[in-house]
Structure formats: structure tokens, C-alpha cells
Amino acid sequence: MFELVERANTTNIGVELDASHLFWQQMDPVAVVRHLRELVVHAAAKDVRVNPTAAIQGVLDNRFRRLDQSEPRVNLGGNEWANAWPVDAAWDFVAVGRGHDAQYWAEFLSALYEVDPKMMVNIEHEDTSLGPIEGLELAASVLKEAAQLAGIAIDELPG
């Protein structure tokens, strides 16, 4: 990211840091926030659970199955379609708190707070085992607990 900013010779490039994509790559989102510092301008709270299958398939599990045109599919735009996720995937997107506990998320929020005390964090919910409201409620509850553990007041939203 630093190289991109340097080559572009600009100061208006920033990172929307999505912890989930770092988790499945076995990266530490807290360390990444502290490394990128002021380049992080927004964050997404989405969790990942690495499953035992990762020991055999690795995190680059490529057992996704292309859906046949006769199967119900989700169009991603143009001629791009979502594939079928492996039944026993190496990792899964899960609601915040189902992959990493509130203490971990407290560290994540603290790192973001060090960069910008008014940093906005949005919840991304892709846990297919939970309904849309249930997943958001769980994530919000874990993040509120994490903020409390980190000593970050969330009583007022900026702006």
C-alpha cells in the first residue's frame, strides 16, 4: 500500500480494512492496522472461522464448485456468478464473535482508535447459519462489549 501511495504521488488514497480477508490469509488485522496507520480510513467488522479442514486443504481451499446454469445462482454482474462454497470449507465467514472473541475485537478497535478516534467501523454479515437480523445483533453485541473492554465510549456517533 505504501508503494501505491508513493508511485501515485498522492495523499488521498486510503484503505478500507476488512479484518475477515486478513484472517483467512492468516494475517493479524491488529498488526496490519498498526503497520498501515494513517492509511486506514475505514474498517469493516466481519469475522472468519478457520476450520479443521484447513490443516489438509489450506486456506487457499479451491474446492468451490461452479454452479450449473439450471441451479439457482447469484449473479455478481455481467457473466459472473457465485460458486458453491465447499460443504466442509477450510474457513467460513461468520458473524463477529464466532471466529474471534470480544477480547480480540477490543484489540482491533483499540488499534483503529489509535489511528483515528472517530474511525467508523461497519458490520458486514455473511454468516449463512444466521438470519440477517440475528447476525447483525450478535455482531453489534460483541462489538459493544469489545469497545467497553477497550475503554472506548460509543455513546455518540461522530457527525
Task: Tell where the protein language model's regions lie, with residue ranges.
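Histidine-acidic metal/acid-base catalytic patches
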Residues: 1-17, 21-159
